Amino acid sequence: MIITAIDTNIYDQPEFVEGRDVIGVRFEDLVLDKRIQRVALPGGEELGLRLNHGHPILREGDVLKADDKTVFVVEIIPTDVLVITPSDIHQMGFVAHSLGNRHLPAQFSKPGELTEKAAMIVQYDHTVVSFLDEHGIEYQRTELVPPIPFRHSGHTH
């Protein structure tokens, strides 16, 4: 079966799953924006994704396939990340500048979203841990599903 569009998300339309079993199909963060891919459903059946150009990134709860009894939905595998919580604006600037020079994709959270303080979120990297430890910058290693997949962007000097 070839899927060309995602029309429903169970979090947008929870009534869609009433009376049906919901089965997650696991995706890594790195493939959520790939338009063309093959995925294996639990039980061995394969689905092909051939989404149109400009299709939004796959997100948690997108319905891949449904019948009268079962709904197969996107389930995003949590990513190993560092949640960095600098003590002040100076330390935040230092961290952002230093990690930015490494061209690491980063995301940011507001106070109260992930931690009490604003945070910078990067994918786990042992060299980043060494840098943070060396400079006494507070961080926590955890797994989470980021709201937007981490992506390396093109870069030139």
From Swiss-Prot:
Induction: By urea and nitrogen starvation.
Chief subcellular location: cytoplasm
Molecular functions (GO terms): nickel cation binding; unfolded protein binding
NCBIfam families membership: PRK13261.2-3
GO cellular component: cytoplasm
Entry-linked Pfam families: UreE_C, UreE_N
The protein's name: Urease accessory protein UreE
Lineage: superkingdom: Bacteria
Cell location: Cytoplasm
Keywords: Chaperone, Cytoplasm, Nickel, Nickel insertion
Keyword hit for RNA-binding: no
Biological function: Involved in urease metallocenter assembly. Binds nickel. Probably functions as a nickel donor during metallocenter assembly.
GO biological process, one term: urea metabolic process
Cystine pairings recorded for this chain: none
